[in-house]
Regions:
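Von Willebrand factor
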Residues: 1-95, 100-105, 124, 128
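VWA/integrin I-like adhesion module and closely mimicked acidic/polar interface patches used
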Residues: 98-140
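Loop/turn elements at helix/coil->beta-strand transitions in domains of secreted/extracellular proteins
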Residues: 16-20, 87-91, 115-122
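Sec/Tat-exported extracytoplasmic proteins
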Residues: 5, 9-16, 55-58, 73-81, ...
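Extracellular/luminal ectodomains of metazoan preproproteins built from arrays
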Residues: 10, 15, 63-64, 140
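A generic alpha-helix structural signal
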Residues: 2-5, 51, 111
Length: 140
């Protein structure tokens, strides 16, 4: 999954005054690994170093709580206090195994309206990717 994130990052012109990228990891909890306000990390080298560190240390395959990730994004990522730029469009791409936990809340309850204009969910399962886009607030 991290290699898919790395490939996606490679497609953008990343920088403090260009495309900014935030990384949130999640399982039974969600954690912001890079925020928009961390300008020193808004370059491909720094983001790739983060991915290398995650690959070496993080475990995949735990509980999937996509709702917690969306809630964290709404509360901690797409905020001006954390570096969100009001005049730039907000796009969120969620990498998931496609099966959020049965106790997950509906996405429309955890992601405030109009925080993001486009959500794309990339479901990776058995090394096959399937891209599904849906309007903000709708569950896949």
């Amino acid at each position: 999954m991290l290699e898919s994130v790395r490939t996606l990052i490679s497609k953008y012109n990343v920088g403090p005054t260009k495309t900014r990228i935030s990384v949130v990891t999640y399982d039974k909890k969600a954690q912001v690994r890079v925020s928009f306000k961390e300008l020193e990390k808004q370059n491909k080298d720094a983001l790739n170093s983060l991915l290398d560190s995650m690959k070496a240390r993080d475990k995949l395959g735990g509980v999937t709580r996509t709702d917690l990730a969306l809630e964290t994004v709404g509360n901690e990522v797409f905020t001006t206090a954390n570096g969100d730029r009001p005049n730039s469009p907000n796009v969120m791409i969620v990498f998931t195994d496609g099966a959020t936990h049965k106790k997950s809340k509906p996405y429309s309850e955890v992601l405030p309206p109009l925080v993001v204009s486009i959500i794309c969910t990339i479901i990776l399962h058995f090394h096959r990717g399937r891209l599904v886009c849906f309007p903000a607030g709708d569950s896949p």
